Amino acid sequence: ELSRNEQDEFIIVYLGDDSTDFRLELTYLKNRTEAYDLGEQEFHLALRTVDIGAAHDRHEKMGCICFENHGMGIYFIEDPDGYWIEIIPDRTKPITWR
């Protein structure tokens, strides 16, 4: 376990292999009573980029951005099968949207 974020409504745990930058994020929603449905996008792949602005510009031109959260500095793209992929910035650099 690399780190943990515990809030009233959820717990997020980050796992890693201690030899690469790979991180697996596991999210537990505390108040959820029903089973997860894949269509709800609770399970998704996230990719980190060193230049979030350039990545955003490229994805915007491709027309594949399906959700943006500028406050969190993230956005999602949708693949041809309808799955969402989260694009996250390298947190060691300032977030700049073009």
What are these regions (language model features)?
Residues 6-11, 26-30, 58-59:
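Short amphipathic alpha-helical surface micro-motifs
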Residues 18-20, 34-84, 89-95:
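Vicinal oxygen chelate
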Residues 9-11, 30-36, 95-97:
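A short, acidic/glycine-rich surface segment
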Residues 1-23:
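Core segments of cupin and vicinal oxygen chelate
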Residues 2-4, 29, 69:
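Conserved beta-strand termini and adjacent loop/short-helix elements that scaffold enzyme active sites
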